[in-house]
């Protein structure tokens, strides 16, 4: 049976680390859909309503559903732009949908970002410009905060 796991949060919060760990743990039959890969790398799209990454993300998730994959959808996925697509996926996957949100402080996200190889790709000033406080969908099953480690987030997700 297909399952959808949505991992959202601001830049530098730990989403990519968690989804990579989940994909490594579950292995074959896991489809990782990373917003940065789809929107920025593959399509060179801007973050704006109607951008083509919305449809491609949904199409890839539907592919995963049709093939009974564990589908990991990871990214910022701002609610004002992506909520309708995420709602459609929630409807498609039904009760096999789990959504998580990284609700870190800006300072913690910057601290985390400084430990990554991507730290040269964008600055704390960029992160501040993109920052959205408490950008919840309203149907998350759990929220991760400054106190939660990668292992805490992994354990929370892998027990579901």
Feature map (PLM): residue ranges:
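P-loop (Walker A) phosphate-binding loop of NTP-binding proteins
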Residues: 10
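Glycine-rich phosphate-binding loop used to anchor ATP phosphates in small-molecule kinases
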Residues: 52-94
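Small-molecule kinase domains that catalyze NTP-dependent phosphoryl transfer to phosphate-bearing small molecules
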Residues: 115-160
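Conserved phosphate-donor/acceptor-positioning beta-strand/loop module used by diverse small-molecule
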Residues: 93-112
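ATP-binding Walker
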Residues: 13
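Hydrophobic anchor at the beta1->P-loop junction of P-loop NTPases
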Residues: 7
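Conserved substrate/cofactor phosphate-moiety recognition/catalytic segment
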Residues: 19-67
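Walker A/P-loop
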Residues: 16
